[in-house]
């Protein structure tokens, strides 16, 4: 059977090789093709923008926003709307033409920079020749797409920071230059390995920028107990990562009799001081993104997707799914509003008022809010616990959750940890163990949740601070084990960021990425001692003796 598409950007790709007929995520071949075309023209735009800067000419910030938006829209489980994707291709072609007109030197521009299309049929035809498999060398292809997937994650973080008024020209310039370099056939494998690590370095900058944006706007996360039950009022469930969307929704629902609940990666919003004043901000409903087909059903009210992860909705609740920002799905209502613009949530609020209250699926509380500022405020307590031997090791279990049955490994691993270990987590991987009763060590909970996937930055800050406090030369001398779960491209930039900080001995699961060729995987093993996972029992024995 010939390939109708090829995509291998997520952990769940078929056979850990690639989706060739339809995406496990639900992406159809036409959608995959339009995403391929969009990435291709975005790389071309990056080439033109990079050359303009080299000529000393300014590149307008709206171009930066177009690039980050394009990259973000192609992240797994973000946008399934072919019309939106085709329109983004058109916008990018127009931007290329506009910028190219200002170039003094137009020689040697790539096809990606010069190709134009307005009809969807032309985009689909082009996609067949410019996707992943267009690069024939296994190792060059592997590195080009490792970099591209890392840039997608970086773009997501840059966009969230931009929404809150923070952006760095150097970050945008790097993203565009790196995209252009993935078109450059003169670059060797060694050049691309160096670019991969440079991508990680800028990934740290992107996460630091977003951390500053979030904490500067909403305060530093603090230890918080979050309700996981429900109230008697109708509600709106907000999923994704965009805190500005949440802020606007909370303001507009105040006094309406409609409660607001977080879902999946929105859970950490409860940790920010600025959101605690809203009495109708009730709690968190459900678990990680992949359980949404059951949980959106039982929530009963409308659901707002602000970013990934959206699973193609069932007909039974599709009319209750609203998208905004870069998210799109054909047939779902989209709430417009670009960066800096007001979003009108009156339609979803009116819809909520016609719905019954959420069906309770669990009750009780979970605790979180252990980002770097909060943990460093407890530094003396933590340091004393380490020095006394009460805490023997920390285990970083940040990252993503997913559908695979093999991910029960992380629950079993957490349950089997020695009682003198503390889990440091961020991202939706936490749902595999954040409701277990793992207790505490001298009042320090054994699961310290820093927040969303981007808050893996907090875990790096904590590690570097501990290195300083204990007077160590190398961050790898700390009593920290890294056992990270990945799913999509934001996890890729987190991994590259950790590597750029010199962190070694990271275990990545439940499988290593399909886009790592054997030789590229070998380089990562040799330089950073990256490994996979086996069984909970064997890994516990290997990590803790």
Curated annotation (Swiss-Prot):
Known cofactor(s): [4Fe-4S] cluster; hybrid [4Fe-2O-2S] cluster
Q: Residues bearing Cysteine persulfide?
A: 400
What does the note accompanying the cofactor annotation read? Binds 1 spin-admixed [4Fe-4S] cluster. Binds 1 hybrid [4Fe-2O-2S] cluster.
Would I find Transferase among this entry's keywords? no
- An example Gene Ontology molecular-function term: hydroxylamine reductase activity
Catalytic activity reads: A + NH4(+) + H2O = hydroxylamine + AH2 + H(+)
Domain of life of the native organism: Bacteria
Q: Which CDD domains match?
A: HCP
- One BP term from GO: response to hydrogen peroxide
Enzyme class label:
oxidoreductase
Residues annotated as binding [4Fe-4S] cluster are: 7, 10, 19, 25
Q: What does the UniProt entry say about where the protein is found?
A: Cytoplasm
Q: EC number(s) of the enzyme?
A: 1.7.99.1
- Cellular compartments per GO CC: cytoplasm
User: Which Pfam family name is an example for this entry?
Assistant: Prismane
Q: Which UniProt keywords apply?
A: 4Fe-4S, Cytoplasm, Iron, Iron-sulfur, Metal-binding, Oxidoreductase
Query: For binding hybrid [4Fe-2O-2S] cluster, which residues are annotated in this chain's numbering?
Result: 241, 265, 309, 400, 428, 453, 488, 490
Check the record and name the InterPro entries matching this protein.
HCP/CODH (IPR004137), Hydroxylam_reduct (IPR010048), Prismane-like_a/b-sand (IPR016099), Prismane-like_sf (IPR011254), Prismane_a-bundle (IPR016100)
Record function comment: Catalyzes the reduction of hydroxylamine to form NH(3) and H(2)O.
The record ties this protein, via PANTHER family, to: HYDROXYLAMINE REDUCTASE
Subunit info? Monomer.
**Which family does the entry's similarity section mention?**
Belongs to the HCP family.
Protein name (record) = Hydroxylamine reductase
Q: Which organism is it from?
A: Desulfovibrio desulfuricans (strain ATCC 27774 / DSM 6949 / MB)
Q: Which gene encodes it?
A: hcp
């Amino acid at each position: 059977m010939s390939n109708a598409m090829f995509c291998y950007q997520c952990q769940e790709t078929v056979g850990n090789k690639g989706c060739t007929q339809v995406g496990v995520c639900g992406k159809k071949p036409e959608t995959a093709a339009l995403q391929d075309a969009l990435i291709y023209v975005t790389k071309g735009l990056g080439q033109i923008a990079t050359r303009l800067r080299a000529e000393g000419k300014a590149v307008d910030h709206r171009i930066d926003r177009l690039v980050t938006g394009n990259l973000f829209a192609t992240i797994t489980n973000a946008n399934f709307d072919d019309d939106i994707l085709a329109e983004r291709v058109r916008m990018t072609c127009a931007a290329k033409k506009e910028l190219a007109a200002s170039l003094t030197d137009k020689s040697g521009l790539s096809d990606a920079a010069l190709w134009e299309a307005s009809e969807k049929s032309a985009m689909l035809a082009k996609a067949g020749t410019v996707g992943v498999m267009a690069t024939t060398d296994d190792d060059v292809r592997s590195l080009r797409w490792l970099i591209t997937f890392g840039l997608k994650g970086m773009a997501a973080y840059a966009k969230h920071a931009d929404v809150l008024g923070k952006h760095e020209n150097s970050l945008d310039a790097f993203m565009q230059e790196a995209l252009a370099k993935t078109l450059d056939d003169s670059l060797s494998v060694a050049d691309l390995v160096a670019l991969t690590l440079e991508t990680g370095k800028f990934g740290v900058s992107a996460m630091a920028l977003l951390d500053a944006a979030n904490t500067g706007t909403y305060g530093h996360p603090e230890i918080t107990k979050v309700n996981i039950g429900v109230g008697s009022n109708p509600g709106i469930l907000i999923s994704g990562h965009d805190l500005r969307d949440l802020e606007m929704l909370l303001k507009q629902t105040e006094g309406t009799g409609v409660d607001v609940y977080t879902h999946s990666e929105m859970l950490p919003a409860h940790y920010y001081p600025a959101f605690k004043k809203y009495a109708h901000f009730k709690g968190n409903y459900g678990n990680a993104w992949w359980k949404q087909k059951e949980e959106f059903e039982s929530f009963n009210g409308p659901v707002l997707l602000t970013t990934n992860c959206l699973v193609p909705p069932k007909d039974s609740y599709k009319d209750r799914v609203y998208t905004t920002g870069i998210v799109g799905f054909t047939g779902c209502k989209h709430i417009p509003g670009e960066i800096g613009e007001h979003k009108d949530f009156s339609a979803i609020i009116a819809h909520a008022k016609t719905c019954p209250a959420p069906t309770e699926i669990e009750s009780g509380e979970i605790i979180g809010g252990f980002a770097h500022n909060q943990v460093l405020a407890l530094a003396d307590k933590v340091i004393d616990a380490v020095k006394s031997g009460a805490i023997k090791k920390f285990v970083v279990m940040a990252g993503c959750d997913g559908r695979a049955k093999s991910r029960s490994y992380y629950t079993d691993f957490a349950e089997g940890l020695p009682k003198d270990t503390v889990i440091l987590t961020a991202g939706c991987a936490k749902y595999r163990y954040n409701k277990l009763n793992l207790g505490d060590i001298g009042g320090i909970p054994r699961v310290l949740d820093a927040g969303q996937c981007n808050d893996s930055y907090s875990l790096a800050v904590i590690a570097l601070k501990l290195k300083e406090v204990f007077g160590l030369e190398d961050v790898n001398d700390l009593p920290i084990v890294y056992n990270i779960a990945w799913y999509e491209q934001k996890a890729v930039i987190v991994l590259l960021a950790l590597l750029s900080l010199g962190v070694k001995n990271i275990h990545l699961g439940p499988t290593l990425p399909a886009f790592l060729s054997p030789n590229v995987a070998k380089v990562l093993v040799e330089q950073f001692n990256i490994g996979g996972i086996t069984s909970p029992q064997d890994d516990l024995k290997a990590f803790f003796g």
